[in-house]
Amino acid sequence: MWTIPTYILAAFAEIGGCFAFWAWLRLDKSPLWLVPGMASLGLFAWALTRIDADFAGRAYAAYGGIYILASLIWMWAVEGTRPDRWDTIGAAICVVGAMVIIFGPRST
């Protein structure tokens, strides 16, 4: 039930944390950006361990599709660049793949 929202939380926490490093190293922001950035990366790691999956690799694989979509949303909302049609098509393919991994029937 909480799988998709938890993946979304993890994605935005990871992106936010990584963006703090990007801002510091590429946008000449203060090193103080790293403090919330590292906290955000800690939240990301914690959230990803809350995923209801039997294997870490499966949780990470499904997360990849959600992460790609979240990255494009971040690019649009935070960086002001709208995804183009190829971004959108690529993200859709990845999200479909993630949904197959998350909701696909498993043999016991």
Curated annotation (Swiss-Prot):
Membrane topology: Multi-pass membrane protein
Annotated Gene Ontology cellular component terms: plasma membrane
InterPro entries: UPF0060
Transmembrane stretches, start-end: 4-24, 31-51, 59-79, 85-105
Keyword entries, A-Z: Cell inner membrane, Cell membrane, Membrane, Transmembrane, Transmembrane helix
Coiled-coil boundaries: none
Location of this chain's protein in the cell: Cell inner membrane
One Pfam family recorded for the sequence: UPF0060
Family to which this protein belongs: Belongs to the UPF0060 family.
Designated name of the protein: UPF0060 membrane protein amb3269
